[in-house]
Amino acid sequence: MKVNLKLIIGSILISQAQAIWPFDSSGSSSSSDSSPSETGSSGGTFPFDLFGSGSSLTQSSSAQASSTKSTSDSASSTDSSLFSSSNSGSSWYQTFLDGDSGDQKTDYAPFNLTCPSKKTFIRTASELSQQEKDYIHKRQETTNKNLIDFLSKRANLSDFDAKSFINDNAPNHNITIGLSFSGGGYRAMLAGAGQILGLDGRYEDANKHGLGGLLDSSTYVVGLSGGNWLVGSLALNDWLSVGDIVNGKSTIWQLQDSILNPSGMRIDKTIAYYYGLAQAVQAKEDAGFQTSVTDTWGRALSYQFFEEDDSGTGGANITWSSIRNLSSFQDHSMPYPIVVANGRTPGTYIINENSTIFEISPYELGSWDPSLKSFSNIQYLGSSVNNGNPNNTDICVNNFDNAGFIMGTSSSLFNQILLQLDNYSINSIIKMILEKVLTDVSDEEYDIAVYEPNPFFGADSAGIKSITTNDTLYLCDGGEDLQNVPFYPLIQNKRGVDVIFAFDNSADTNSSWPNGTSIQETYKRQFSKQGKGTPFPFAPDYKTFLDKNMGDKPVFFGCNSSDLEDLVAWHENDKINVTDVPLVVYTSNTRMSYNSNFSTFKLSYSDQEKFGAIRNGFETVTRNNLTDDENWSTCVGCAIIRRQQERLGEEQSDECKKCFQEYCWTGGFKDAASVSSVSGISGLAAKTHTSGGTSSTTQQTSTTTGSSANGGSSSTGSSSSSKKKNGGDLVNGGVPSSIFLVFNSLLGLIIAYL
């Protein structure tokens, strides 16, 4: 904790420098701004005054923003010397240095209790856990009813009896829908917020002009990194609707000030904030547990993701497993939430397709991959075990699975900065310093989350013993293997997912738009030892993705299961049928009414930016409020029922065939991302369709240009030309924010050597 505390002290010092930093520390030169009240092609302002909803995003947020801003302004303008007059002459700084905790809480620390009578905490990953089975069984009683309603009213399929189709076939198979939200920092959280809002039947405008009811019909929801900030913060706030955030009923996601400097110029409040973080993490260390920067990062995130209570501890005592106790979970009104993270071996920087992918649910942490093939009870993380059996039945641990820590685990940023440093336009001398600092930080493993004791120590089902012989389990950002859209939990055959709605808000190009890398990498992974047994539809490489403008509108992958016969056969698992491979409905972040291509490392957002990104996300998933395609909801209905129709041998309707002609990518092995090095796969080239056709090629590209609100350089919102030019380059924005993160570490390291 000594170095960790010094890093925090460094953060305090450097956070104050933001006031005089010569660049925009909250913005990205790769993102263009436009007002959220700006009229898009749909006309009207979000949320849809045009349609008579009687509410305006600008209006609904203005009171809240004004209240927040007045507090912030008064805090920053009352005393130009950075100190509140109430603290004048006081020894707040001495209190900090002396370590007087005042009334700060330490609920973050895990604590001991007697072990439960069940003596083993791990199981082999051969089936779903009984708890998940029970939840899904009850959840699908609800989703079936909601899906009947969605297909009948929203999709309005012709000559289709939704009630009999769903109910008559339920004894054999319930249609299972999974939602997958990509990583990408606050950009992904906010764009994803608009996308999930467009599916939410609790939000009236989604029912009138979107896909309202689809969220209510979904069985699973998965998030990674920034996408998990979305999923986690909604789930842990008792399945909060984004509509309540938009309308000011909830005060979470206050992003006006950077997470590094949430109190603006009030250095006394900043000191108290960082001291609270330090004290919480120190309490965990004092309890005998190793900590890392992820602990501090997770605690900081919690202040933004949870409503403040009287204790003022910012969710310090909220655990991931406590989702089980929420009313929306107990009545099965929320989809089953899952987080994705990666295993990261200490000393490594690059995580390839053979990495171990972990998933975290309200009940378990573990991996289906053959390298581990085990799951552990998340409630007892931190307990010392051997093959899941407590080493001391009198002492088990609770509270290790802090919600902020779990969300921080899935979004560690430091290794990402190191991996992408060459893509930043930084002065060579500064770059040399940063490389040295980042190497030192990475060498000390500050960029990962530390799970010690290792919950899988001695696990006998693991294929790679190095995971189970180490006292510590190391996890990191779920997108570091380039699978930034978390498909992994949803392609496990045991879950029986029919269709995945994937929302890609990645920053693959220099302009911070997606280029299909995520879906390409998941497709390729199935041909590795780790991925064998998880068939995934053919997917194009990023060049094809850009050439065909596939980011401009949704694309369906794996439309016809008959095209996947040889692909499934390659997996050599007779328990997997072609209809078990989910159809993927892929939606990319693209400009509709707002340039939401912010840097991943942008750490503060004005209300204009926040609500502009949410609005734009809503429009991407609803095809611009159904104005770009009035039949979009019908086509979504066709995608949902496709696999069940194929199981039953039912012919697709003419209207669904028309939808598939419009949205399906029909490329086969020859058109897909290259996997030429994979043994035994070459025969597929001659056996699959090679048209690669999709009418996405005819979609006009958006080339609206917006200017940055802060007077910085502007960039085009094009989803085609700019992406083609940039190809597969990594994000090149947000340098100031990244530098602040790096300088936090730099100052901490300097202090460490004093």
Curated annotation (Swiss-Prot):
Domain of life: Eukaryota
Keyword Secreted: yes
Assigned EC number: 3.1.1.5
PANTHER family the UniProt entry points to: CYTOSOLIC PHOSPHOLIPASE A2, LYSOPHOSPHOLIPASE 1-RELATED
Location in the cell: Secreted
Species for this entry: Candida albicans (Yeast)
Protein name: Lysophospholipase 3
Region entry Disordered, spans: 25-88, 687-727
Gene: PLB3
